[in-house]
Amino acid sequence: MIYIGLPQWSHPKWVRLGITSLEEYARHFNCVEGNTTLYALPKPEVVLRWREQTTDDFRFCFKFPATISHQAALRHCDDLVTEFLTRMSPLAPRIGQYWLQLPATFGPRELPALWHFLDSLPGEFNYGVEVRHPQFFAKGEEEQTLNRGLHQRGVNQVILDSRPVHAARPHSEAIRDAQRKKPKVPVHAVLTATNPLIRFIGSDDMTQNRELFQVWLQKLAQWHQTTTPYLFLHTPDIAQAPELVHTLWEDLRKTLPEIGAVPAIPQQSSLF
């Protein structure tokens, strides 16, 4: 099994694809990257509506709120964690994983706080961690310590692949904005648990995206044997994200013919 989705479930330009709600999005994709929870908790009635609009086969991968990962830096935040998990509890059977997106200021010295935080989390969920500090990508003791600690706890490494967007010509504001905001970190495809999460940050050049994605075809074919990967596809202008899925899917299908149920992705070429 492999889960493939986008960073969000609606966009004005997706109306032409028949995607205007979470319910309609879930007819095409089997998971979504939950970016909204980084910035604010949804209201209880909104969480219930999300449950009503999906089935038990769908998976949410929500980010921990920034109040936990950034402001508190994982310290003295038990009440915030409880509030977050309680708020999202109606969706508990559909949680693919909760994951931390740590800022670049969170370095090796902060690892004890990360271990304490992860060790205090409830055991019924899968978890992931995305790091951005340069030392965690230097192939030294700091990176080894991080990977070893995640592996020991069964926590997934969230892998950011921003090569496409940083290789793109900065010919649009969307590209320039993404190049400013998306970290430019090395891609180390390290497996630390059973649900590796890949965030592929494409550009608006679909030919280039396809070329740079080739490395993931081999890796996903390998990981798919023993794990359940999550693949989230981004574009600088998120309106083009379904087109990126369509661009890459043929190669995915050739590489992983046995992956089972796949998103019923509409044809994009005439729409963008």
Curated annotation (Swiss-Prot):
Organism superkingdom: Bacteria
Matching entries from InterPro entries are given as: DUF72, UPF0759_sf
Q: Which NCBIfam families match?
A: PRK10302.1
Family per UniProt? Belongs to the UPF0759 family.
Protein name as it appears in the record: UPF0759 protein YecE
Q: What is the species listed in this Swiss-Prot or TrEMBL entry?
A: Escherichia coli O157:H7
Q: Gene name?
A: yecE
